[in-house]
């Protein structure tokens, strides 16, 4: 295919898309009904497109059903076809990416090398391993009775003496008492090797197949390796860690590679002797290359007492360069043409001897790392980004381990603790959607699990997985059978402590119930008409109100019983030499003394003046009472009273079918008697309050509201009875 063909194909595809879009915007059915020829052409084109779609689908799957064009399901049909085409295009892109990767690997002059596949007959992931902690000379202490003490016995390459570096720092607002990082001053003030600042030719790694790793598990082999490391300028280091059968975790294996050799160090067997490697690890003239040393630095100082000065972290280098991914597997594949496998990343590295695939996997982590370091260093120097990577590497090297009990109150990247949250069980509540009212039960189970894990040096998830803890909170079994038969994943620790856990759950539920009852508010007696409470008060609030009320009552009683102040005493007689007097001011503004006797005289004069006052009688006008004239009740003679008994019809009378409605005249009223209608003045409008022109306005007619409570609709128009046609007839029966 020439370079011009893709452009021609693209232009044709664009024209097809434009034509289809313009056709879709028209009323095709309307034109089909108008023109028979257009309808035939359109149907033939649609059938041709359906045949092409069926050919494409049948070429992928011979058993796939063919598409049939039907107007009722054409949208679903083409949606399915579009999904199939999307999958085909994605597969094409994936194949093109593979082809480009193959071309790039060939252009580099070497094929991609793979980690060997092994049968794994001598590796059993389910095999029970004896806990190596039982053989340690220094027993594991998980009590956290004191801050973490560095395991340094001596301090090589020191700028500050060991005694000064291991002084306990007093607690402050954010940090409890702790021991500082013993090599923090050296990491900040010692310079890197001058060779790391220069662009140098890349040194290729030794052949993978021609070299064999050296296993180090004795003191003699350790000292021999140490002498070899002292004569190097760069070393690559990595660790394998296990944290499932240990509370804090243990370092199981250390991989160290030089330009010539690969070492695999048994850190379980040489745990007490590896501190001598500080002579190399703290030497700033030897570059220590790690990848992602974020946790490796913590594990080295916690288990082995090792610290790193002169760290180069390839993880931060890959980020500074701007690589799409920053994993070690990506660096191995793109910079060393080596395809590793993460199959054994989470394997149990405590087993001895190591299987062949585990040995190969551990060796691959550091075998190519120095060559990758050469390539990344040159790229960083060319882009002027090396200083930033060294700064980040220093910060990683200054990280220190601290027990959870003595962690800083404010989380910091410089300090690592196994538990960094104040209430870690709340994370489980969020993950498993546990209601807040069961937080007490979650906390009790979490603390019990943590206590057992510390005692037996097991991980909390080994004692009781999070799923099992959430199930206990959800189902709350309160007997042994309920705890044991809760799920299939009941651990040995839970099975052995089933009775204790059942009692713990029962007590926690009782505490939750009591807490809820105490926190339930007592409603007041004041309620609205619809039953809604106006106010709610709790028991402590009632007690507070009662105490305040009693204080007020006592204070009022004491005030009422208080005697007035006098100028004499029962025992000593009259104390004050002068009489009591008040002060009055004259018109001139000068004060004059007013004695008590004067006040008494004034009071007597006031009383006598009140007695001489005449009583004034106010007459209240009574409303005018109009006498009501009652009509005289006339007695009627029973003889002259009309008879209302039904009369018997006479058969000889005439029956009139229609009769004129002639109203009888009312008898004239007696002269001299005038009858007036009563007037209701409350309904008469006030003339003075009316606005001008208001009476001229027409009143609005009352409209019928169908949604009102009054269900009576407007009355229909009154119909007139049709007049009888013909003559009026009368006949005899």
From Swiss-Prot:
Keywords: Exonuclease, Exosome, Hydrolase, Nuclease, Nucleus, Phosphoprotein, RNA-binding, rRNA processing. It comes from Saccharomyces cerevisiae (strain ATCC 204508 / S288c) (Baker's yeast). This is Exosome complex exonuclease RRP6. Belongs to the exosome component 10/RRP6 family. Mn(2+) 1 binds at residues 238, 296. One of its GO terms (biological process) is RNA catabolic process. It is an enzyme of class 3 (hydrolase). Mn(2+) 2 binds at residues 240, 365. Changing residue 449 to A: No significant effects on growth at different temperatures and processing 5.8S rRNA, U24 snoRNA and ETS RNA. Reduces exonuclease activity. Residues 662-733 are annotated as: Disordered.
